[in-house]
């Protein structure tokens, strides 16, 4: 530590020893000590969060590392897979693959695997999403090789016994029933299904209940053959030197054989969308024309989802073994928009318990690689929102628009919060709200009012410098605080390399947030809620609404039809019709 300051002291001592002489013209003598210190400082210009490296192995596996020292290190394997790429034959396999992680392999029994995982300490898990399958672990530094070994075994060489498969299908059935009992869990699923009808991001994240009887070893193996290939893998390390990370990845994944099967397009540019657009447009127009009868319009979508009342599946001639095709892998997400309504909630058995109407309004958002994604994230933070009751008392988020303009102004609103889902080639942006029964139309009008206010140039509701500055600061602080978690840091590294091919430095992200202006946010708001996202899938620009109304004894309510909902949204100049 003392050596760091030695050159500065030498400079000070030498200057005191110099004799006093008259200044002469000519070049000044070079101070070697000061020059060396300056050069050393110039070399280390990167911040600790920018010390990332990426290496591609000979078989296509990408190895990414970020060497931030800590007591814990992280390792994760990220696979280009997920529900958006599933065809009818493997529908729901992502969910079951998630459940089958860290079970028996050719070298360990399920009990031995569990025992080894428990000895590691820390956190080891598997999670599936619409666009990725993630195996992650945060553990002690010395246990990283063991964690990589366990991941390699469960990814490359699982036994997939009938007993394990049957057990996880039963667990999935319980999860399906559980999610239907919670509106905050099922409604986001339904929003995706209505927004991307019959394609890609509209595929259910969990296994449909009627599909559970068809999930077998052959379905799982078909899924693995399509996605578990070296060119689809990113192995990420946090807190591990890059040379060590590459050696571990080479040891456990370097001998995977590359496949000649079609690759994954992250933009959808490899496939013409003409046929897709025409097909989806027909489906969208049919939905729009018949959706005034809510039970009729929602039946098709609900039958594809994990309905709690789904009957036992009957043999389907179309569910023969069909490998994942090039079209399945490269099809862009086509936003259709639409309306979906759930059966009304019955009055609670306990009259003292409240019941609420739930409504979600969404528009096509932006792809994660879009230049305007930072502005859209700032708009979500600016809208903010939450619930009418805060366990911690007044505090964070109380100055967001949905708090000040909605929750604080309308006592019949239970919750109101903005959401923003971003994917590789599309997204969803909107507001989710819950209100007292009989207030559905006023609630929809309030939601439309707040979204429309983001686009206005003048007036009291127009965006202001102060609130935009506050939202930018909140977004930056949230980003930085989240990255303090080793697991979040690890997932951020792995997913960014998977999507962008590189790690975007935190300094770059915070700079781009800080550079945003009121005009930028207003322009992006007009683009998104105006139905002009213009993503690769050539979306319709129509709004998406998912509704579940509540009933109360003694209160008569009139169900809203799709035409009335569209008229209300159009009055606020939102979306396209």
Swiss-Prot record:
Q: Where is this region: Disordered?
A: 259-301
What PROSITE patterns does its record include?
INSULINASE
**SUPFAM superfamilies per the record?**
LuxS/MPP-like metallohydrolase (SSF63411)
- List this protein's GO terms for biological process: protein processing involved in protein targeting to mitochondrion
- Alphabetized UniProt keyword annotations: Mitochondrion, Transit peptide
- Principal subcellular localization: mitochondrion
- Record-linked Pfam families: Peptidase_M16, Peptidase_M16_C
Q: Which GO terms describe its molecular function?
A: metal ion binding; metalloendopeptidase activity
Q: Which InterPro entries match?
A: Metalloenz_LuxS/M16, MPP/UQCRC_Complex, Pept_M16_N, Pept_M16_Zn_BS, Peptidase_M16_C
Transit pept. (range) = 1-35
Where is this gene product found? Mitochondrion matrix
Q: Which GO terms describe its cellular component?
A: mitochondrial matrix; mitochondrion
**Compositionally biased region (Low complexity):** 269-301
**Binding partners and assembly:** Heterodimer of mpp (alpha) and pep (beta) subunits, forming the mitochondrial processing protease (MPP) in which mpp is involved in substrate recognition and binding and pep is the catalytic subunit.
* Family membership: Belongs to the peptidase M16 family.
| Note on domains (UniProt) | Appears to contain two domains of approximately equal size which are separated by a loop-like sequence.
The free-text function statement in the UniProt record for this protein reads: Substrate recognition and binding subunit of the essential mitochondrial processing protease (MPP), which cleaves the mitochondrial sequence off newly imported precursors proteins.
Question: What name appears for this protein in its UniProt entry?
Answer: Mitochondrial-processing peptidase subunit alpha
* Annotated source species: Neurospora crassa (strain ATCC 24698 / 74-OR23-1A / CBS 708.71 / DSM 1257 / FGSC 987)
Its gene name is mpp
């Amino acid at each position: 530590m003392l050596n760091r300051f030695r050159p500065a002291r030498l400079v000070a001592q030498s200057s005191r020893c110099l004799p006093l002489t008259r200044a002469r013209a000519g070049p000044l003598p070079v101070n070697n000590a000061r020059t060396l210190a300056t050069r050393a400082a110039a070399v280390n210009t990167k911040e600790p969060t920018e010390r990332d490296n990426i290496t591609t192995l000979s078989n296509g596996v990408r190895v990414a590392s970020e060497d931030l020292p800590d007591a814990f290190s992280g390792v994760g394997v990220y696979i280009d897979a997920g529900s958006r790429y599933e065809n009818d034959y493997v529908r729901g396999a992502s969910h079951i693959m998630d459940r089958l992680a860290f079970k028996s392999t050719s070298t360990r029994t399920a009990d031995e695997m569990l025992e080894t995982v428990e000895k590691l300490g820390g956190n080891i898990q598997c999670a599936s999403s619409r666009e990725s399958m993630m195996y992650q672990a945060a553990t002690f530094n010395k246990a990283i090789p063991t964690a990589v070994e366990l991941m390699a075994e469960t990814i490359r060489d699982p036994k997939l016994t009938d007993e394990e498969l049957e057990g996880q299908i039963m667990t999935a059935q319980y999860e399906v029933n559980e999610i239907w009992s919670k509106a905050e869990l099922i409604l986001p699923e339904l929003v995706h299904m209505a927004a991307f009808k019959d394609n890609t991001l509209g595929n259910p994240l969990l296994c449909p209940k009627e599909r559970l009887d068809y999930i077998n070893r052959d379905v799982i193996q078909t899924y693995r053959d399509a996605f578990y290939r070296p060119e689809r893998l990113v192995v990420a390390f946090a807190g591990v030197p890059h040379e060590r990370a590459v050696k571990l990845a080479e040891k456990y994944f370097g001998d995977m054989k590359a496949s000649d099967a079609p690759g994954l397009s992250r933009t959808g540019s490899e496939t013409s969308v003409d046929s897709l657009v025409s097909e989806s447009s027909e489906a969208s127009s049919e939905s729009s024309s018949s959706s005034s009868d809510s039970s009729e319009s929602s039946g098709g979508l609900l039958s594809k989802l994990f309905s709690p009342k789904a009957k036992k599946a009957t043999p389907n001639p179309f569910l023969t073994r069909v490998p994942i095709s090039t079209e399945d892998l490269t099809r862009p997400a086509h936003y259709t928009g639409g309306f979906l309504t759930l059966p009304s909630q019955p009055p609670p058995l306990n009259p003292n318990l409240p019941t609420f109407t739930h409504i979600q309004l969404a528009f096509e958002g932006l792809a994660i690689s879009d230049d305007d994604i930072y502005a859209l994230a700032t708009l979500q933070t600016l809208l903010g929102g939450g619930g009418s009751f805060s366990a911690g008392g007044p505090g964070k988020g109380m100055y967001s628009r949905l708090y000040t303009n909605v929750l604080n102004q309308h006592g019949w609103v239970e919750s109101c919060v903005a959401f923003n889902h971003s994917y590789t080639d599309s997204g969803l942006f909107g507001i989710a709200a819950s209100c007292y029964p009989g207030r559905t139309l006023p609630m929809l009008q309030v939601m439309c009012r707040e979204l429309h206010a983001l686009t206005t140039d003048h007036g009291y509701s127009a965006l202001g410098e102060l609130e935009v500055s506050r939202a930018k600061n909140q977004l930056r602080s949230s980003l930085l605080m989240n990255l303090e978690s080793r697991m979040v840091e690890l997932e951020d590294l792995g997913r960014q390399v998977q999507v962008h091919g590189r790690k975007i430095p935190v300094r770059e992200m915070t700079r781009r947030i800080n550079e945003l202006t009121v005009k930028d946010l207003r322009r992006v708001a007009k683009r998104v809620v105006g139905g002009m996202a213009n993503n690769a899938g050539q979306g319709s620009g129509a709004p998406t609404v998912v509704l579940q109304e509540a009933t109360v004894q003694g209160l008569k309510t009139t169900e809203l039809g799709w035409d009335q909902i569209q008229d209300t949204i159009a009055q606020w100049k939102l979306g396209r019709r």
